[in-house]
């Protein structure tokens, strides 16, 4: 009775699956027939195909054959225990899973080849359109000059005169090769959120909370501001370079101003009540603090009509 109840409960779902299977088999059969006719007519050349795709198609076909055999035995009331088709299905499935990473690596190249074979040309946004060409690295003017020199040589040979060779030519730098830029606004926003999360995870608040609730032993270190630590590392690197190369590196005005501002920031007391922005971790709106905004210099505008001051000559 229990088996009869299970059979009655599974009967509607089994009928639905059989109907879906019949529809899918009919659709696949029609697609295969149309492809076979096109291949036989010569619409799709197959003499130079990919062996990887051929092996994959053969494995999928064998998998479907064994699966159909199992469905037939199951519908006839047979047992699947120790069935040879089950072992073959497991083996083919393992091979297909091993081929999946290779399929992901070849997906772009295969799609590009298929699209090129169907349309006859590459896409406008294809990155391979912007690859460097050796012909673009050569100056067009130099080739024209060479042609003119050859024409002059021919004329001089005809008239009995010798042309002067080895004249220096003007150097023309090669043009820059265009690069496709396909970054969207969503990708830029994602990168900005990732930078905000990294900045929040490296803040002093998160570090202190981690040390408070962690079971690891406390690490005692010199608590300094990150920009002070970075500045000391740069100074040490500069000192090591000067001592090893026996040279004195010059410091620009911009570097001096940056060090001066860093010293002022480290000496101010407003940082005692300042907490880093961790809204990227809590799901809030990420915003920049006043200290994170870049400092812009005022552009000096020259005043017209004013002469430079000079030394007055004494009489």
From Swiss-Prot:
Phosphoserine PTM positions: 121, 142-143, 204, 214
Biased composition (Basic residues): 295-315
Annotated stretches, region: Necessary for interaction with EIF4E: 41-174
Region (Disordered): 124-169, 277-315
UniProt keyword list: Acetylation, Cell projection, Centromere, Chromosome, Coiled coil, Cytoplasm, Nucleus, Phosphoprotein, Repressor, Translation regulation
Coiled coil: 13-41, 181-205
Subcellular location per the Swiss-Prot or TrEMBL entry: Nucleus; Nucleus, Nucleolus; Chromosome, Centromere; Cytoplasm
CC annotations in GO: axon; chromosome, centromeric region; dendrite; filopodium; mitochondrion; nucleolus; nucleoplasm; small-subunit processome
Composition skew (Acidic residues), residue ranges: 144-156
One Gene Ontology term from the biological process aspect of the record: ribosomal small subunit biogenesis
Source organism superkingdom: Eukaryota
Keyword Iron-sulfur appears in the UniProt entry: no
Modification N-acetylalanine, positions: 2
Single GO MF descriptor: RNA binding
Family stated for the protein in its record: Belongs to the SAS10 family.
Subunit structure: Part of the small subunit (SSU) processome, composed of more than 70 proteins and the RNA chaperone small nucleolar RNA (snoRNA) U3. Interacts with CPEB1 and EIF4E.
General function of this protein: Part of the small subunit (SSU) processome, first precursor of the small eukaryotic ribosomal subunit. During the assembly of the SSU processome in the nucleolus, many ribosome biogenesis factors, an RNA chaperone and ribosomal proteins associate with the nascent pre-rRNA and work in concert to generate RNA folding, modifications, rearrangements and cleavage as well as targeted degradation of pre-ribosomal RNA by the RNA exosome. Its dissociation from the complex determines the transition from state pre-A1 to state pre-A1*.
UniProt name for this protein: Neuroguidin
Organism of origin: Homo sapiens
GN (gene name): NGDN
């Amino acid at each position: 009775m229990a088996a009869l109840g299970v059979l009655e409960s599974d009967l509607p779902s089994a009928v639905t699956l059989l109907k879906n299977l019949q529809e899918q088999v009919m659709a696949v059969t029609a697609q295969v027939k149309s492809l076979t006719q096109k291949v036989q007519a010569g619409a799709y050349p197959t003499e130079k195909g990919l062996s990887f795709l051929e092996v994959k198609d053969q494995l999928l076909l064998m998998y479907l054959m064994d699966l159909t055999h199992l469905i037939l035995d199951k519908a006839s009331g047979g047992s699947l225990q120790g069935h040879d088709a089950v072992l073959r299905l497991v083996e083919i499935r393992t091979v297909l899973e091993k081929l999946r990473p290779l399929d992901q690596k070849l997906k772009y190249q295969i799609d590009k080849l298929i699209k090129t074979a169907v349309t006859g040309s590459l896409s406008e946004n294809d990155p391979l359109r912007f690859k460097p060409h050796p012909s673009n690295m050569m100056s067009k003017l130099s080739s024209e000059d060479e042609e003119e020199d050859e024409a002059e040589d021919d004329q001089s040979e005809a008239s009995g005169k010798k042309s002067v060779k080895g004249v220096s030519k003007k150097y023309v730098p090669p043009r820059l090769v265009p690069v496709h830029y396909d970054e969207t606004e969503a990708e830029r926003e994602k990168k900005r959120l990732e930078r905000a999360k990294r900045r929040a995870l490296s803040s002093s608040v998160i570090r202190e909370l981690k040390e408070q609730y962690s079971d690891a032993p406390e690490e005692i270190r010199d608590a300094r501001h990150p920009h002070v630590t970075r500045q000391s590392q740069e100074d040490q690197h500069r000192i090591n370079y000067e001592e090893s190369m026996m040279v004195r590196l010059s410091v620009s005005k911009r570097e001096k101003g940056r060090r001066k501002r860093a010293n002022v920031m480290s000496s101010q007391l407003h940082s005692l009540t300042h907490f880093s922005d961790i809204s990227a971790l809590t799901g809030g709106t990420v915003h920049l603090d006043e200290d994170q905004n870049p400092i812009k210099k005022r552009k000096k505008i020259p005043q017209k009509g004013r002469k430079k001051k000079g030394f007055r000559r004494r009489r």
